Amino acid sequence: MRKVKPARKLGRTAAHRKATLANLTTQLLVYKRIETTEAKAKETRKVVEKIITKARKGTVHAQREIFKSIRDKEAVKMLFEDIVSKIGDRNGGYTRIIKLAPRFGDAAKMAVIELVDYAEAPSKQLPGKQDRAKRVKGSKKTEVVAAAAGE
């Protein structure tokens, strides 16, 4: 009797799915935070958690095993030098998935997946006066207000 495997197919062939997850994993390791669909984020989390756990061993064998799935020297180097040293003694749970609003075009469920210790608080800085545009009375054109008021 056929049994259902506990993995999402993501509407792709096995090779395409493997390549997609490898690319998402590489991008997550390089940029520390990526926006994708919720299903892809959940599948990427499984791969990334296993890779980081292997990388914590720090052996050459672990590095070769990880390189089999990632295939990007810079990402593997960054993983072993930067990410593993920053994650330190954390026992799993290296990633976080934050759900977003549905995508406009097709209403797909979207999410942000990020490495936990690299999460940056979003800046709530308002643009300065020199960045704001001011509408000129009587015309539809805008002028950028200079930093000095005397100009």
From Swiss-Prot:
Q: Domain of life, per the record?
A: Bacteria
Q: Which keywords accompany this UniProt record?
A: Ribonucleoprotein, Ribosomal protein
Whether Ribosomal protein counts among this entry's keywords is yes
What Gene Ontology terms describe what this protein does at the molecular function level? structural constituent of ribosome
Q: Which SUPFAM superfamilies match?
A: Prokaryotic ribosomal protein L17
Record's Pfam families?
Answer: Ribosomal_L17
Keyword check for Ribosomal protein: yes
- State the Gene Ontology BP annotations: translation
Question: What HAMAP family does the entry give?
Answer: Ribosomal_bL17
How does this protein assemble? Answer: Part of the 50S ribosomal subunit. Contacts protein L32.
Q: Which NCBIfam families match?
A: L17 (TIGR00059)
Supply the name of the protein: Large ribosomal subunit protein bL17
| Species of provenance | Chlorobium limicola (strain DSM 245 / NBRC 103803 / 6330)
Its taxonomic placement starts with: Bacteria, Pseudomonadati, Chlorobiota, Chlorobiia, Chlorobiales
